[in-house]
């Protein structure tokens, strides 16, 4: 029963400048950008190649979300840096230190699971299961520090990883524990 992860989202952050004038950025023609400082303190900007969305703050910090790989997140941030440099911001770091904050991945065990049995077998230490609040079982893996959402369909969502290997290891740990308890058939 071989399962692998599929990366669904990478959240990365960086600092592209000492500060940004978001009003000036809007006036300079950043096409499709949204900024309403009363509702949210950052400017929202989306690109399609590679697909990503950015939150741009006056502090010069940028959060990139929506990429399907670390490479795409990095490429999207470089794309943004070049765009900003060309339209409004001369003092942009074109080689920023990009840090992955979170990776969300999915996996499928390809078998139905009895979440009540899993919750009882695992005890209360690393597991939360309240089906009247949330349909999935929440399993917290200590190392690597990831959270695995387990659904009765056998589908999993793994979040909190800083690299794909964290998510792969989280999946391996869950599969091993389920297998050791005789829960995978």
Swiss-Prot record:
Gene designation: tbp3
Pfam families the UniProt entry points to: TBP
Alphabetical keyword list: DNA-binding, Repeat, Transcription, Transcription regulation
Family label: Belongs to the TBP family.
Coiled-coil residue spans: none
Official protein name in the record: TATA-box-binding protein 3
Gene Ontology molecular function, alphabetical: DNA binding; DNA-binding transcription factor activity
Reported function: General factor that plays a role in the activation of archaeal genes transcribed by RNA polymerase. Binds specifically to the TATA box promoter element which lies close to the position of transcription initiation.
A Gene Ontology BP annotation from the UniProt entry: DNA-templated transcription initiation
Chain positions of Sequence repeats: 7-84, 100-178
